Regions:
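Short linear/disordered segments characteristic of secreted peptide precursors
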Residues: 11-13, 20
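Extreme N-terminal basic, low-complexity initiation segments
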Residues: 2-11
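Active-site beta->alpha loop and helix N-cap motifs at the rims of alpha/beta catalytic domains
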Residues: 47-55, 61-190
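Catalytic alpha/beta core domains of metabolic enzymes, predominantly
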Residues: 173, 184-216
Length: 216
């Protein structure tokens, strides 16, 4: 029965000059792209539920390697009590690649029940095999989930066109709101702003991005 703590609610975010430069560059690209490619459809309003601080939940384990549901339950209650705006389950922070399919399903059921509709929920469903990601989305009960968080394909190092085609297939396979996840330090490839904008303008259910490229 290990004690689970999370200091994310107390973390201060400091903006560096590099980050400011990146934001200014992205904003300039957005303005140019919007002018050249006016969007005809409106994004899914689910994105409005995901404003504020979203906490990526870890997966606590016992010494024997099994999931510690008691600790996970305490962690969920802690985040809700400390004013998290929404929860992210089964992301990379949850060590999802190390979980079996049955563990993923059981963890999702547990978090959904424990949350009991108190906060919006985002579920991580991603990978480097497009077909497997789509099959997982279609076979998962998403009735209590507000959006899918899907990471850029890792290890394979796809081209920008390959990244576009990956997310295009996912967006066309579901009506669920999709959050892109760009973390090149982990995946080995950076999704460029132009690719993000292309996807966002062409697919209204792509509603947001978790941008973790930093100084990549």
């Amino acid at each position: 029965n290990s004690k689970v703590t999370n200091k994310a609610a107390n973390t201060k975010i400091h903006t560096t000059n590099t980050e400011k430069h990146y934001s200014q560059k992205l904003f300039a690209i957005c303005k140019r792209y919007d002018k050249a490619n006016p969007k005809k459809t409106q994004p899914d309003m689910t994105a409005n539920k995901l404003i504020g601080m979203g906490i990526a939940l870890i997966t606590p384990f016992k010494h024997d390697g099994s999931v510690d549901y008691e600790a996970l339950g305490k962690l969920i209650e802690y985040q809700i009590a400390n004013h998290a705006d929404y929860l992210v389950m089964l992301g990379t922070t949850a060590e999802t690649p190390t979980l079996t399919a049955s563990e993923r399903n059981e963890i999702a059921r547990f978090i959904i029940a424990k949350n009991n509709k108190r906060l919006p929920l985002v579920m991580g469903i991603g990978g480097n095999d497009t077909r497997t990601v789509i099959e997982q989305i279609k076979s998962t009960d998403l009735s209590h989930v507000d959006a899918i968080l899907s990471v850029v394909p890792y290890y394979n190092k796809p081209s920008q066109e390959g990244i576009y085609q990956h997310y295009r297939a996912i967006a066309q396979a579901t009506n669920m709101p999709i959050i892109l996840y760009n973390v090149p330090g982990r995946t080995g490839v950076n999704m460029k702003a132009e690719t993000v904008l292309r996807l966002a303008h062409e697919f209204p259910n792509i509603v947001a991005i978790k941008e973790a490229s930093g100084n990549f």
